[in-house]
Design a protein with these regions (language model features):
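SAM-dependent methyltransferase catalytic region
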Residues: 1-219
């Protein structure tokens, strides 16, 4: 299952969804012959790597959301010696404007393939120099795919989700509302969003974007 909060804030909704995933998977453990790889820690790390995504325009909120996920990994671990190095969440919880989009290079599938190979390696890498090298390569691939456009785009930063299911299974969150928009922003939203009519409210824009992010049958 792939879950996204496009206005992630401090990460309350993704952490809540992670706990639901863990509760469900843990309930099934008693019915399985092997318990290997089915600790609470294993479930949490797997959910963070494979199920949870978030975006926020506020860098401070993004860092708090990352910290919240990191803390959730170690909070139940009684033996500090058993705690593994924390994963790298830079391409899981991302700073960006969820209402933006980017024109893509039409001939970029090989770039996406490489990007989707590097991100799991970056997530799990503990060596500082290797992390820097992976991040450098990932950022360069994103630059090439976007033709140097630095705006955020879900289909680029979370491309693995859209290549497998063409969207998320679940989009959650509390859409921001009542934000002050410049005339330039209003013109952009009127061009890109059907809900941008009359007095434009970011709540409606986020709701429209959330629906567009869903895979077929998503909620």
């Amino acid at each position: 299952i792939r879950i996204c909060d496009p206005a992630v804030g401090s990460g309350a909704f993704p952490v809540g969804m992670m706990n639901e995933i863990i509760r469900t998977r843990n309930a099934l453990t008693n019915y399985l012959k092997t318990k290997k790889g089915r600790t609470i820690y294993d479930f949490k790390r797997h959910a963070i790597q494979n199920s949870l995504y978030g975006v926020d325009i506020d860098l401070g909120a993004v860092e708090i959301a990352k910290l919240r996920l990191w803390l959730s990994l170690i909070v139940d671990e009684e033996d500090i010696k058993q705690i593994k190095p924390l994963p790298n969440l830079d391409y899981k919880i991302v700073q960006g404007n969820s209402l933006s989009s980017v024109e893509q290079n039409l001939f970029n599938q090989p770039l996406f393939t490489k990007l989707e190979e590097l991100k799991p390696a970056f997530f799990n890498e503990t060596n500082a120099s290797k992390k820097r090298e992976y991040k450098k390569q990932i950022d360069e691939l994103i630059r090439l795919i976007t033709n140097n456009n630095q705006s955020f785009d879900f289909k680029i930063y979370f491309s693995e989700v859209f290549h497998k299911k063409n969207g998320f299974d679940v989009v959650i969150g509390n859409p921001p509302w009542g934000g002050d928009l410049s005339e330039k922003e209003k013109a952009y939203f009127r061009e890109k969003f059907q809900s941008a009519k009359g007095i434009i409210d970011t709540y409606a824009l986020f709701t429209e974007r959330a629906i567009a992010l869903l895979s077929k049958g998503g909620i």
